[in-house]
């Protein structure tokens, strides 16, 4: 299983990563730049890391997840990823109109350096698997989130696996659940071939 570190928005955090791991970053448009920051209205322009600076320092072999906090930045993200020769990545949490737009681009190979491998669809206890799988020919990943209950049972896993889609789990602490729930989730997926998990505590997943 690949370990993707949650919310790596500074160079200090990036420097601390195992080079075999991946990272999730939060991307916003601010003062004519793409910057890494999670919370709106709390941006200190003096301390913001630009996405380009992040990419110029990116050496990890794992997947880079781009959690989009602003719309309309997708093309610039792809351009920068191409510039720095980063190919192992995907967009997360696009609004539905933009997701559909870019899913069609991916399916039709309309953008250089952008393919279904760079998109995920969401599946959770609130978001039905059937909806996510309706995009199966346009995406490479299923993002499995857990708000109140873990949705990935054997039936759901087999449906995803039959479409040759990679699974990225959301570790329970990212939704405010107790850290002990990591152990419970690990037990539930012990017989599944899970590609990745996004977590604050990769050491508890290893």
Per-segment meaning from a language model:
Residues 1-206:
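Phosphate-group recognition and catalysis centered on beta-loop-alpha active-site segments
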